[in-house]
């Protein structure tokens, strides 16, 4: 069988689709290798998932100052291409798959310079900068959306957003995470790297609406699978616990602010399969990967889109989830006034169950398999 290289990295939105597709290709007998930034998140994820990894240098193509490229980043990008060429010449893959983001660029450009076939996956509704650089010489582009701005009509193949299609029982997931099995579980995540804004705003909002005891007043034990031990006998409120993935660099800032709340669990990094399986409700940004994982696990969302996302794509992502009945959108500028009310609305049992069904209906089951099919179509015939 063939060796397929996954050029990926930077954020979970680029990395986890590569992991899901690599696993699918492995199951079909192919060998896979993740190629990304040396020392990046992708190196850690590959080790955790038992996948082979090679690291190279990588430079962000962001612009600084008066629209001039940062020469240091350009140098790193060029050096990364040189290093990636060495890796590909040594490993001789049949095909390289690019998942977008600056960390994928060295591998994709190196492959194209060596005449190795490339296939791309675009996770957003707008073709990213790295993909725009590479798309002209790519054999095919798999997409998560029917229409992708910047990609000529008919040049993309809708495959969906590959996610790790693994499910745990709620009880097993909560056991692994050290959570109680009774309370309503709220998962807070600002993407794979965390979100400074959510880290600053969510703890105070949840403290305000849940109080020191962590209770949703007025919902009672019907709000979730509540053990009597977690229902306050006087307030009659439903017990809540929070799992907040802050991102490693911000844990030290968030943890002291919630240390007095027994129901609030701040962690730097969490296994997202377990976290989604444990969650009854989540407060998140609106990256495509996050929304796809929530849909697969049937988790209702309160979404705070990143306003700086290109073409405001996170807002439009979130709006599509809300229109499908699977969540609520709270714009960042309105968080102080609206976030608490949105959480209370989505925690109401009838609303939450309806949103869960709507989320499951949005799930693009089998995306990794469909993308693997597309990749196999472009493997050289032996």
Curated annotation (Swiss-Prot):
InterPro entries tied to this protein: GlcNAc_MurG, Glyco_trans_28_C, GlycoTrans_28_N
Gene Ontology molecular functions: UDP-N-acetyl-D-glucosamine:N-acetylmuramoyl-L-alanyl-D-glutamyl-meso-2,6-diaminopimelyl-D-alanyl-D-alanine-diphosphoundecaprenol 4-beta-N-acetylglucosaminlytransferase activity; undecaprenyldiphospho-muramoylpentapeptide beta-N-acetylglucosaminyltransferase activity
SUPFAM superfamilies: UDP-Glycosyltransferase/glycogen phosphorylase (SSF53756)
Substrates-to-products reaction catalysed: di-trans,octa-cis-undecaprenyl diphospho-N-acetyl-alpha-D-muramoyl-L-alanyl-D-glutamyl-meso-2,6-diaminopimeloyl-D-alanyl-D-alanine + UDP-N-acetyl-alpha-D-glucosamine = di-trans,octa-cis-undecaprenyl diphospho-[N-acetyl-alpha-D-glucosaminyl-(1->4)]-N-acetyl-alpha-D-muramoyl-L-alanyl-D-glutamyl-meso-2,6-diaminopimeloyl-D-alanyl-D-alanine + UDP + H(+)
Cellular localisation: Cell membrane
Residues that hold UDP-N-acetyl-alpha-D-glucosamine according to the record: 11-13, 124, 164, 192, 314
Superkingdom in the source lineage: Bacteria
Top enzyme class: transferase
Name of the protein in its database record: UDP-N-acetylglucosamine--N-acetylmuramyl-(pentapeptide) pyrophosphoryl-undecaprenol N-acetylglucosamine transferase
EC numbers on record: 2.4.1.227
Biological process according to GO: carbohydrate metabolic process; cell division; cell wall organization; lipid glycosylation; peptidoglycan biosynthetic process; regulation of cell shape
Pfam families: Glyco_tran_28_C, Glyco_transf_28
Functional pathway: Cell wall biogenesis; peptidoglycan biosynthesis
Family: Belongs to the glycosyltransferase 28 family. MurG subfamily.
GO CC field: plasma membrane
């Amino acid at each position: 069988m063939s060796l397929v290289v996954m050029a990926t990295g930077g954020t979970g939105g680029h990395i986890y689709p590569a992991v899901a597709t690599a696993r699918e290709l492995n199951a079909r007998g192919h060998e896979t290798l993740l190629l990304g930034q040396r020392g990046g998140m992708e190196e850690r994820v590959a080790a955790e998932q038992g996948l082979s990894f090679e690291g190279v240098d990588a430079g962000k193509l962001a612009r600084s100052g008066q629209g001039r490229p940062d020469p240091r980043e350009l140098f790193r990008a060029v050096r990364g291409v040189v290093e990636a060429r060495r890796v590909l010449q040594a490993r001789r893959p049949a095909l390289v798959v690019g998942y977008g983001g600056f960390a994928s660029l060295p591998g994709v450009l190196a492959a194209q310079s060596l005449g190795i076939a490339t296939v791309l996956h675009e996770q957003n509704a707008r073709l990213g900068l790295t993909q725009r650089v590479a798309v002209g010489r790519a054999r095919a582009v798999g997409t998560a959306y029917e229409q992708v701005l910047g990609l000529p009509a008919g040049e993309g193949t809708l495959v969906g957003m590959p996610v790790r299609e693994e499910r745990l029982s709620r009880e097993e997931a909560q056991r692994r995470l050290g959570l109680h099995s009774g309370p309503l579980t709220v998962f807070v995540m600002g993407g794979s790297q965390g979100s400074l804004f959510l880290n600053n705003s969510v703890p105070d909002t949840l403290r305000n609406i849940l109080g020191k005891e962590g209770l949703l007043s007025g919902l009672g034990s019907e709000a979730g699978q509540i053990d009597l031990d977690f229902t306050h006998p006087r307030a009659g409120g439903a017990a809540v616990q929070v799992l907040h993935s802050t991102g490693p660099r911000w844990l030290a800032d968030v943890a002291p602010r919630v240390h007095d709340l027994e129901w609030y669990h701040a962690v730097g990094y969490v296994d997202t399969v377990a976290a989604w399986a444990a969650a009854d409700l989540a407060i998140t940004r609106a990256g495509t990967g996050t929304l796809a994982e929530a849909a697969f696990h049937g988790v209702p969302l309160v979404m705070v889109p990143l306003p700086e996302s290109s073409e405001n794509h996170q807002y439009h992502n979130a709006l599509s989830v809300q229109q499908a009945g699977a969540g609520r959108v709270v714009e960042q500028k309105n968080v102080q006034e609206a976030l608490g009310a949105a959480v209370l609305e989505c925690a109401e049992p009838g609303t939450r169950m309806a949103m869960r069904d709507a989320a499951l209906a949005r799930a693009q089951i089998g995306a990794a398999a469909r993308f693997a099919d597309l990749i196999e179509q472009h493997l050289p015939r032996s």
